[in-house]
């Protein structure tokens, strides 16, 4: 125990030195705590304060905010994380804070820890026992919290199965998305990723490792799923799987009228009287603002629109005097032995009742893996063009279905029409509230409406215009507030306690009680700015 306190003293001293002298570097923690002993994270080199470790951990995908940690832990196993948290909890006085970094894909510093410790979760993925395992009966997959969803997919496909619910981008960690919710086009029928978790291993703010599920330690299970890293870190998740299809017919349908677009989207996600759903396994949508950037936006949409197709859509918008056009994106999955004619017939039948513009249906046939990992190719192209590592002032909202037309008029046909250039996709699609578990920490719009929309305005500041884009986001939120649109922010970041209280609404008191129970010293995930 004496060695642990030497570790704490060294860390606090390092943090104070950084605060006093700036971010010019750090002193190796092992030098401050020279006594070697089994499990000493500092002496083993796993806990580092050098700039090569701390500077990369001070930034995230958003490229908007930065916060230098005092140290970074590179754990070899969950036991190293537990040791760090036990040491932090046992520290006298005001302990250091701890955050958990997967791919660093937060946009507003949610995974940063100014003057604290950032845990580099992906360090647990190297060596040792496999951290992704499909059950013998093919019912579930166990995955380490540090594992990427794309690797979970590949391991599961090798056994002929796959998780049911995804995010659009698979190069994120299991623990990262489950700490938020994890939404995509499958959410309408299977719920978010958190609704598909069977069991977790969690290390709490006490440094205690707990296995939890709906049957055992259910309060912690519900707290952690969608809990923004406030109650513990997920080191293992058991996720339900289903038989994996071989291929997908990937369809895009173009609309010039928002009412027809949203009505068809809601028709596609509506459950039948027996609770089942239609043949579409994935339903999303996109908005393309008319104007000089319309053709470029269309041609960057997954290869669906050729130059000639884009020109036709531009002409359609002009003929209808439309300020925006809309596209439903959907997939129909099928087996390897399905014939092209049978797939064509199934798609034709599924499209029969829809009201898209005649002649404006586009499709591709792809492997199931190619579809799910579709965004990665776009990332590679943007990376090569130097447009990936730019500021990303994203705005993600859950909007009640009854108010989505008001949002369209006020935002897509209003505020965004004054923007000089829009770089980044504008995504919009409905999901069913009944597929979400109200006991979990994630929040959805209040009220009894079954349908709400996921709206993701994924702006990229490619023209050094991040301040203007952030101001635009504030205008959008102010419009929603003044119009009484009862939205909830997804992947939220607020600067005041009052905003967080409003965000959680009826869940706030329970959220606070759970924080006091599982992280009473407020050690975990300080970058969320909820309790710190």
From Swiss-Prot:
The keyword Glycoprotein applies. Keywords: FAD, Flavoprotein, Glycoprotein, Oxidoreductase, Secreted, Signal. Residues 65-244 form the FAD-binding PCMH-type domain. Residues 1-17 form the signal peptide. GO terms for biological process: cytokinin metabolic process. It catalyses: N(6)-dimethylallyladenine + A + H2O = 3-methyl-2-butenal + adenine + AH2. GO terms for molecular function: cytokinin dehydrogenase activity; FAD binding; oxidoreductase activity. One of its GO terms (cellular component) is extracellular region. Disulfide bonds: none annotated. The modification Pros-8alpha-FAD histidine is found at residue 105. Glycans are attached at residues 52, 63, 133, 321, 432. It comes from the Eukaryota. Its EC number is 1.5.99.12. Monomer. Belongs to the oxygen-dependent FAD-linked oxidoreductase family. This is Cytokinin dehydrogenase 1. The lineage of its organism: Eukaryota, Viridiplantae, Streptophyta, Embryophyta, Tracheophyta.
């Amino acid at each position: 125990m004496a060695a642990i306190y030497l570790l704490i003293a060294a860390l606090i001293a390092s943090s104070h030195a950084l605060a006093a002298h700036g971010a010019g570097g750090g002193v190796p923690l092992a030098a401050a705590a020279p006594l070697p002993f089994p499990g000493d994270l500092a002496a083993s080199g796993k806990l580092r304060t050098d700039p090569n470790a701390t500077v990369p951990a001070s930034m995230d995908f958003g490229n908007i905010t930065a916060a230098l940690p005092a140290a970074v832990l590179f754990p070899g196993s969950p036991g190293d994380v537990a040791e760090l948290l036990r040491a932090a909890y046992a520290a006298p006085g005001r302990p250091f804070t701890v955050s958990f970094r997967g791919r660093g894909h937060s946009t507003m510093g949610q995974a940063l820890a100014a003057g604290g410790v950032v845990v580099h979760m992906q360090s647990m993925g190297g060596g040792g026992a496999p951290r992704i395992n499909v059950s013998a009966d093919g019912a579930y997959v166990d995955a380490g919290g540090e594992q990427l969803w794309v690797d979970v997919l590949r391991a599961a496909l090798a056994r002929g199965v796959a998780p049911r619910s995804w995010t659009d981008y698979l190069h994120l960690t299991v623990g990262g998305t489950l700490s938020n919710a994890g939404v995509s086009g499958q959410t309408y029928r299977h719920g978010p990723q958190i609704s598909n978790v069977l069991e977790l291993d969690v290390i709490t703010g006490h440094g205690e490792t707990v296995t939890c599920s709906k049957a055992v330690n259910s309060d912690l299970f519900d707290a952690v799923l969608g809990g923004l890293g406030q109650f513990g870190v997920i080191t293992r998740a058991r996720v339900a799987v289903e038989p994996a299809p071989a291929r997908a017919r990937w369809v895009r349908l173009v609309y010039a009228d928002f009412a027809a677009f949203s009505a068809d989207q809601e028709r596609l996600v509506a459950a039948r009287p027996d609770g089942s759903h239609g043949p579409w396994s994935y339903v999303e949508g996109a908005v393309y603002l008319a104007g000089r950037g319309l053709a470029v936006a269309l041609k960057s949409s997954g290869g669906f629109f050729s130059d000639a197709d884009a020109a036709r859509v531009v002409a359609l918008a002009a003929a209808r005097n439309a300020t925006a056009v809309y596209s439903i994106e959907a997939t129909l999955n099928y087996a390897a032995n399905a014939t092209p004619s049978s797939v064509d017939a199934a798609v034709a039948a599924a499209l029969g009742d829809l009201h898209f513009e005649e002649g404006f249906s586009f499709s591709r046939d792809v492997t199931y893996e190619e579809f799910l990992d579709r965004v990665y190719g776009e990332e590679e192209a943007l990376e090569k063009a130097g447009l990936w590592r730019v500021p990303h002032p994203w705005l993600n909202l859950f909007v009640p279905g009854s108010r989505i037309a008001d949002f369209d008029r006020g935002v897509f046909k209003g505020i965004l029409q004054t923007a000089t250039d829009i770089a980044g996709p504008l995504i919009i699609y409905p999901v069913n509230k009944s597929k979400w578990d109200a006991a979990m920490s994630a929040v959805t719009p209040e009220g009894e409406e079954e349908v709400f929309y996921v709206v993701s305005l994924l702006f990229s500041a490619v023209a050094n215009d991040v301040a203007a884009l952030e101001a635009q986001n504030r205008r959008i939120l102010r419009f929603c507030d003044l119009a009484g649109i009862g939205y909830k922010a997804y992947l939220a970041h607020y600067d005041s306690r009052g905003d967080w209280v409003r965000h959680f609404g009826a869940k706030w008191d329970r959220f606070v009680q759970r924080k006091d129970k599982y992280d009473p010293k407020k050690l975990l995930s300080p970058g969320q700015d909820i309790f710190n």
